């Protein structure tokens, strides 16, 4: 397996230190995704973390194994070779990673499903902007709704292309994410996730149109009941115009 084509390695030690110092990680189990040459790995180990690093590239795994042989031997570092979106992960508490841009979305969804205490993750700035898009605005999408339903997200700082090798064509953003209970009760998480995905897959359609298309998933009788009971303003809206409470309302009616 080779490294992701869009993987850009951090090279600025001052920025690495700044990232590693955001949280107190001494004695904590930290998951690192895409360690590359190990510059962030080293900083995490120096701060007393027990690190689990997942790397796709077998050549990089071999280099990391040589560089951190003593840390692997004493159990402070575990290396896993594979795709972080798919590979089985041992228990961890905190996530710190310079994510390859191409897996930003699937790994974020996976981490939210698994659960963690806090995550410091680096994204393409445009992706981070979409994560932070407010419900009810045009830039809002599946990513922003799911993230803001199940987590708090804060922007730490932006990074210039020169902080990486090779330099990307865009700026990057470091985000601090902490899971939380939904602001509005959700009776069935899977139904909520399915609903949000289906609504934004058909984002140019109204809620009513999409619900009727989901009769095969939920049953015509259930869909007819939900359409009958929902606020007409919600039914006539497109998904980007909805708020978190609206998604919860629709989902809970589908699961009742």
UniProtKB/Swiss-Prot annotation:
It comes from the Archaea. The keyword Cytoplasm applies. Its EC number is 2.1.1.-. GO terms for cellular component: cytoplasm. One of its GO terms (molecular function) is RNA binding. S-adenosyl-L-methionine binds at residues 8, 10, 34, 55, 83, 98. Gene3D superfamilies: Ribosomal RNA adenine dimethylase-like, domain 2 (1.10.8.100), Vaccinia Virus protein VP39 (3.40.50.150). The keyword RNA-binding applies. It is an enzyme of class 2 (transferase). PROSITE patterns: RRNA_A_DIMETH (PS01131), SAM_RNA_A_N6_MT (PS51689). Keywords: Cytoplasm, Methyltransferase, RNA-binding, rRNA processing, S-adenosyl-L-methionine, Transferase. Belongs to the class I-like SAM-binding methyltransferase superfamily. rRNA adenine N(6)-methyltransferase family. RsmA subfamily. NCBIfam families: ksgA. Specifically dimethylates two adjacent adenosines in the loop of a conserved hairpin near the 3'-end of 16S rRNA in the 30S particle. May play a critical role in biogenesis of 30S subunits. This is Probable ribosomal RNA small subunit methyltransferase A. It comes from Methanospirillum hungatei JF-1 (strain ATCC 27890 / DSM 864 / NBRC 100397 / JF-1). The gene is rsmA.
